[in-house]
């Protein structure tokens, strides 16, 4: 017999951020600004995506643009194929964060999820041209992924994707570079010329 009530057992299936750091410059992941999150998935280590009923369907319905993520298969739909075959929450968190940033108007591009020596604890690294925006996208991605897992067994699980994207768009509009400055910065970065916002 289990030692916890149904609700307690489900609440143990969580994604917790132990630490979030903004690495503003060359780092162990890349030469560009990066957000590095230390993430504890606890019991979710035992729940790859293919073992969660309805997860793939909800995720691909809520974020259909994930079809463009190539992932390790190096082909359109590669990431969603990984989700169907079974991948872990931090890998999914990485891709969902990048896609939410992209849909909000701040392209990301780089992402990695790597195990640490502690079971269930991962490092997730993401392109972070603006730390506050990427951090907000990471938190929204966590909420979306947990809602798609539906461990509360809701008869109609949902997540306000449009609301999350609109919130991130507001942050991009108020904190990120305007279109002309962004083009200049993009060109500088393409030529390995560092750029830092001075506000």
What are these regions (language model features)?
Residues 1-199:
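Preference for protein termini
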